[in-house]
Regions:
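ER/Golgi luminal nucleotide-sugar-dependent glycosyltransferases, focusing on the catalytic module
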Residues: 3-323
Length: 323
């Protein structure tokens, strides 16, 4: 595992899933999209336009506290779109990413609407393949998230078993002593020395699972997550000083539940990780040159895009793809 690199599954065949051509059903699935946003409101609005066509979806937007006042009035004014008044200062590698997701899930549940799915996406995603509405309709009750079992003996468990100092839970995009410090802590853990032990370890009967932050889950799974957290405060404590807890938190809850069998190891998002030293904890920002790889991925979404880096690739998918 490469620092905070998520295990994004780029599967192109969904084993056991139902093709949209297998079932004819005119019922429209109702989806709650929960978006984490921190920049480019115009681009965010174009993504929202993609996913709320035919009013089959509601969109809940959390704007990072650092840019909330600047962006909140620029998000699309639409009865199907709600910008949360509450905002969290989201930081890389920190529990704040989990906090923002929990806040969004609670907002969806507070609506008391019968959504079929709750899909967590970022403001730099785009829909890149037609037919997502029919795909959801024909795959109800499936949980779309990446989840890889990590044995307790694996050194990557250091992400959760260490109570990471704040300086190690920050993002450094250049060579920095604290980046080296983080590597040293990981190496020592692998040798059996945990110099910052987490006092809130998970029970031994809990299996650890790692994957991407992004998911698409049925409403009852969202309710299960919130109910579980309210009944088991110790679980949150076990991750509050972990490194990149958003890549473990929800997978571990679900994969230790009775709903484990519903998980499809695919979050329906295509991305590619940057291989440079400076940006290797980030997915690359797509350009027009990436269109072939995006389309051949057979995923419904892709990230990340940036209108200030290459707007033409955004135009390409906006003009061709509908929900």
């Amino acid at each position: 595992m490469n620092e905070c690199k998520g295990m994004e599954s780029h599967l192109t065949e969904f084993s056991g899933l139902v093709s949209k051509n297998c079932i004819e059903n005119t019922t429209v699935p109702h989806t709650a999209y929960i978006l984490q946003v921190h920049k480019n409101p115009d681009q965010v609005n174009r993504f929202i336009d993609q996913i709320i066509s035919e009013e089959q979806a509601d969109v809940f937007v959390h704007i990072d506290k650092k840019t909330h006042n600047e962006l909140c009035r620029k998000i699309l004014n639409n009865p199907n779109v709600e910008v949360l008044d509450e905002n969290i200062d989201v930081k890389w590698g920190d529990i704040s990413q989990v906090d923002a997701t929990i806040l969004l899930l609670k907002k969806v549940l507070d609506k008391q609407k019968s959504y079929d799915f709750v899909c967590l996406r970022s403001g730099q995603d785009l829909l890149v393949k037609n037919g997502f509405r029919d795909f959801l309709l024909n795959n109800k009750n499936k949980i779309f998230m990446t989840a890889t079992h990590i044995e307790r003996s694996n050194s990557d468990v250091a992400f959760q078993n260490i109570s990471w100092p704040k300086v190690a839970r920050k993002q450094y995009n250049v060579f920095h002593p604290f980046r080296v410090f983080r590597r040293i802590i990981m190496r020592l853990y692998g040798w059996g020395f945990n110099i910052f032990p987490n006092p809130y370890k998970l029970p031994e009967e809990f299996s650890l699972y790692h994957g991407s932050s992004w998911f698409c889950i049925p409403l009852n799974i969202a309710r299960y997550i919130i109910d579980f957290l309210e009944r088991n405060e110790w679980y949150y404590d076990a991750f509050k000083n972990a490194l990149c807890p958003d890549e473990w938190f929800f997978q571990t809850i679900i994969m230790n539940s009775e709903y484990k069998s519903q998980v499809v190891n695919n979050n329906l998002i295509y991305l590619r990780w940057d291989q440079t030293f400076k940006n290797r904890n980030h997915p690359i920002t797509f350009t027009l040159e990436d269109i072939n790889s995006i389309e051949s991925s057979d995923q419904y979404f892709a990230r990340k895009f940036d209108q200030n880096f290459d707007n033409s690739v955004i135009e390409y998918f906006i003009n061709r793809i509908k929900i």
